[in-house]
Amino acid sequence: MSGLTGALGLIQKLLGRKAPEVSMEELRALRRVLHPAGDPAAREALYTPPTSEAQKLTDNEFNRRMIATEMQKKLDEVPTTAFYRSDNSLAGAYQLSPDKWDTDLAYLLSNQPGLGTQLLEDAYKAAKQLQPDRRVRLNAIPGSEEFYRKQKQYGWNEGVQEGMPVFIRRARGGLAQARRAL
């Protein structure tokens, strides 16, 4: 099962139930289907080079607005920091999910050179204020993995969870240090 057809099938199946419970296996399947890296056609479309410089700008604008829109939808669910400059020089957003062992940074985007690293550091500091003893995990936006690989000097390490690339920065001291000592 892959692509939009698979996602719609899973959603219909979940909505048709009388009981609202959803198993972890079903959530993983839905994540694989909805995540563009899980669908070869979507993955190919993501990496298709733009036909012209004008098209590239249009695509960048579309991506910024799409992520900003997605962030707006989630503002009520999870604490989110999002910003967008009207001069199109920068769009940035991060989302903190404190309900798990890891603090997740689900979205992070910057389209201006040099500001991505600062946004990442700001998001990390916000996550550490939220839960000082927990490590911080970042789910990279497909196609942005190279940027995060360059952040290793700041303590970010690449891993894979459920077949998806993630970047984790461990907590300094506290519970994380105690677990390593065991």
Question: What do these predicted ranges mean?
Answer:
Residues 90, 132, 140-165:
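Conserved active-site alpha-helix within GNAT-family acetyltransferase domains
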Residues 105, 135-140:
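Conserved hydrophobic beta-strand within the GNAT/NAT acetyltransferase core sheet
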Residues 112-127:
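Conserved acetyl-CoA-binding loop-helix of GNAT-fold acetyltransferases
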Residues 1-8, 13:
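Hydrophobic, membrane-inserting alpha-helical segments
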Residues 73-92:
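Conserved beta-hairpin
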Residues 97-112:
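Conserved acetyl-CoA binding element of GNAT-fold acetyltransferases
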Residues 8, 15, 25-26, 173-175:
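Glycine-biased, low-complexity coil/linker segments
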Residues 16-73:
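Short amphipathic alpha-helix that is part of the acyltransferase structural core
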